Regions:
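Bacterial N-terminal signal peptides that target proteins for export
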Residues: 1-9
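Compact beta-sheet-dominated domain cores in extracellular/mature segments
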Residues: 25-199
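C-terminal motif of bacterial Sec signal peptides marking the signal peptidase cleavage site
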Residues: 16-18
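Flanking scaffold residues of small Cys/His-coordinated metal-binding clusters
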Residues: 11-14
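Bacterial signal peptide processing site
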Residues: 20-23
Length: 199
């Protein structure tokens, strides 16, 4: 019995000395690991049969700013001659097309991003933002309903509206023109439907 006790004591002491020592010093010139914050970018498309497809990718703020700058540059270069054909090919990192409506969940076009566009043949299109997942906050999935805080519209004008199952409010809405930039949405906490139309 003494023999096994001694052996256990030696083993424990060896483990403490081998594993319990002071941590190794990190060289002072070693760069600190700094992760870029990723934002989700959700692209929603209406298929010809009327069903919706949803694709979500993740981008950094730097990539998001590059997309915004690319769209700004194209709109500046085309002036009043902007057409949907010009903008459909504007894609950066398989992101949102330049002709899409870009919705953001933070002010000043930051945060998670949802991209919507209307089928070319349709005069108007509606979407319940409560049907689109924005993020997962344990233990819940959070949707885009009541979450839009800024937007950058695309080729189609439209509105964000506050709707129930039977009607939409005539007092609480945010309309926008084609290629309009809104860095703050005043009724953002109550807007749960998106609407695009062909003028």
């Amino acid at each position: 019995m003494k023999r096994s006790s001694t052996w256990m004591m030696v083993s424990a002491l060896t483990l403490v000395m081998g594993c319990g020592g002071a941590p190794e010093d990190v060289p002072p010139d070693a760069p600190e690991a700094q992760e870029d914050v990723l934002f989700s970018q959700t692209i929603l498309r209406e298929r010809p049969d009327g069903t919706m497809s949803q694709e979500t990718t993740f981008i950094t703020r730097e990539e998001q700013l590059a997309q915004i700058e690319a769209r700004d540059a194209l709109v500046r270069s085309l002036g009043a001659r902007v057409t949907q054909q010009d903008l459909d090919d504007l894609l950066i990192d398989s992101g949102c097309a330049g002709s899409s409506l870009w919705l953001f969940d933070q002010t000043s076009r930051t945060g998670n991003q949802l991209c919507l566009y209307k089928q070319a043949g349709a005069d108007a299109a509606w979407l319940n933002l409560g049907t689109v997942i924005r993020k997962f906050t344990n233990p819940y999935f959070v949707t885009w309903a009541n979450a839009v805080r800024s937007l950058y519209s695309g080729v189609h004008p439209g509105a964000l509206q506050s709707c129930t199952a039977t009607s939409c409010s005539t007092l609480i809405y945010q309309s926008f023109n084609a290629y309009q930039l809104l860095n703050t949405i005043s009724y953002g906490t109550q807007l749960n439907w998106a609407y695009l139309y062909t003028p």
